[in-house]
Amino acid sequence: MRFFNNKHKEKGLKAEEEACEFLKTLGFEIIERNFFSKFGEIDIIAFKKGVLHFIEVKSGENFDPIYAITPSKLQKIIQTIRYYLSQKDPNSDFCIDALIVKNGKFELLENITF
């Protein structure tokens, strides 16, 4: 188990808050933040044009944050999505996205599983 100090947690929360604001400018409706299950966590769940977007937010300054989304992390995200949909609407169209925050800039990578 990894432990993070408060500074790291605050930085992550700030990045997620800024990410939500950025997503809203792109027409996303934020449905939920930090959804937890026994399988893992989804940073942001958003809705746009009839599709649920499960968004993993990664930030970094000295490395490319996309590399923090490992196959193991992606598997946990998928299990958490399955749980979420089983509780809400199993027939929803969805995709998994990554929102990369680096040096104050945002890059949305849609459908990262394909």
Curated annotation (Swiss-Prot):
InterPro entries: Restrct_endonuc-II-like, tRNA_endonuc-like_dom_sf, UPF0102_YraN-like
Pfam families tied to this protein: UPF0102
GO molecular function terms noted in the UniProt entry: nucleic acid binding
SUPFAM superfamilies, sorted: Restriction endonuclease-like (SSF52980)
Protein name: UPF0102 protein Hac_0727
Domain of life per record: Bacteria
Gene3D superfamilies found in the cross-reference section: 3.40.1350.10
Family: Belongs to the UPF0102 family.
